[in-house]
From Swiss-Prot:
Pfam families: ANP (PF00212)
Top-level taxon in the UniProt lineage: Eukaryota
Similarity annotation: In the C-terminal section; belongs to the natriuretic peptide family.
GO molecular function, one term: toxin activity
GO cellular component, one term: extracellular region
Disulfide bonding pattern of the chain: C9-C25
Main location: secreted
Species this protein is from: Crotalus atrox
GO process annotations (BP): regulation of blood pressure; vasodilation
Compartments where found: Secreted
Tissue: Venom gland.
Name of protein: C-type natriuretic peptide
Amino acid sequence: AKKRAGNGCFGLKLDRIGSMSGLGC
């Protein structure tokens, strides 16, 4: 979940957590 959904979604800020990064998309 590093650059999975945090590519262009709001998960960029939550990309560090990696958990909410997927929920971003």
